Design a protein with these regions (language model features):
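Class I S-adenosyl-L-methionine-dependent methyltransferase catalytic core
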Residues: 1-205
């Protein structure tokens, strides 16, 4: 019997994110970083406009809109608009802040660790105990410094329904210690406010 030849998947197919990765971050999960960003700028003597890189965001992302409204210089890109974080070099910046694709989480963290750039990435907190992630974080802790967390005191909904998972920010070289932040509600039911990009596109009335 002849050996069946493996067919290589086209490159573009490999880069497509899982549809479940596309969660639009509500604004109050962005604004809750204010105090931490101020402290970061103080510690690092940033006396100019802060440069924030949002690698998984279009111009209508709440990250991009909020940071621009508050005086930061924002560099953003998204694979759907032709800017591929995994293929392109990281631009010069002070901070990387975004809600990355969960299906490629290890690649995201590995690239940022290698670049040495401080970051705050919003993600399911359970991922820290996935074997491949825990090992990556432990090895980086041995090499440089440990991951810290900014943890909301509520499960946050991204679509108006009760959230099934706990999300928070994985931080590296951004905050000095793990902290909890208070949120006024969990963004579900009568408190639900869709991300700007959803409202603008008409996905949510």
């Amino acid at each position: 019997m002849s050996e069946e030849k493996q067919i290589e998947k086209p490159r573009a197919v490999k880069l497509v994110y899982n549809l479940n990765d596309d969660y639009r971050t509500p604004r109050y999960l962005v604004s809750c970083l204010d105090t931490f960003i101020f402290d970061f700028m103080q510690r690092h003597n940033v006396n100019r406009k802060l440069v924030v890189y949002c690698p998984f965001d279009t111009e209508e992302s709440e990250y991009v809109r909020y940071f621009k409204e508050n005086g930061a210089e924002v560099i953003h890109g998204d694979i759907k608009t032709g800017q591929d974080f995994f293929e392109n070099p990281i631009p010069e910046c002070d901070l990387v802040i975004s809600n990355p694709p969960f299906s490629r989480k290890r690649e995201v963290f590995s690239k940022l660790f290698a670049a040495g750039i401080p970051f705050a990435l919003l993600m399911n907190l359970q991922a820290m105990q996935y074997q491949e992630m825990g090992q990556l974080f432990f090895e980086e802790q041995q090499r440089t410094e440990a991951i810290q967390f900014i943890i909301p005191d509520k499960k946050v909904s991204f679509d108006g329904h009760t959230s099934a998972f706990c999300s928070g920010y994985y931080c590296w070289k951004f905050v000095e210690k793990t902290s909890f932040v208070h949120l006024p509600h969990n963004n579900s039911g009568k408190f639900y406010v869709p991300a700007y990009s959803l409202t603008k596109q008409g996905d949510v009335q």
